[in-house]
């Protein structure tokens, strides 16, 4: 099924998700699998460093589900100071995830960063 026509959407549900970057590999933050029949509109995405030390963070849009395919960096290896938050996406720079797209994040040190994402599930 194709992603919905946004004008003809029958449901828009506000959601928030959280992800711990438990490794230094790319981790799926938000996923819209093929055949979902949905479009996900990302309103905000924040990265929080939960330690006292600087951690470098990369956040990217992927042209396949589950951080597959090619990554297109939204922010690349940005240093996040200890006990600080980086606002990566906000209402002035929203992203749409069509079917078979995802957002992923990577931290330079495992178990030091959490990512929260507020989005609209449109179908």
Residue map of PLM features:
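Beta-strand signatures of extracellular beta-sandwich domains
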Residues: 58-62, 116-118
């Amino acid at each position: 099924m194709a992603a919905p026509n946004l004008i003809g959407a029958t449901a828009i549900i506000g959601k928030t998700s959280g992800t711990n970057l438990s490794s230094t590999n790319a981790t799926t933050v938000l996923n819209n699998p093929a055949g979902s029949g949905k479009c996900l509109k990302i309103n905000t995405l924040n990265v929080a460093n939960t330690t006292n030390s600087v951690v470098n963070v990369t956040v990217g849009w992927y042209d396949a589900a589950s951080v597959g395919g090619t990554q297109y960096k939204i922010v690349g290896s940005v240093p996040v100071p200890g006990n600080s938050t980086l606002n990566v996406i906000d209402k002035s720079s929203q992203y749409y995830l069509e079917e078979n797209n995802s957002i992923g994040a990577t931290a330079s040190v495992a178990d030091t960063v959490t990512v929260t994402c507020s989005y609209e599930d449109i179908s």
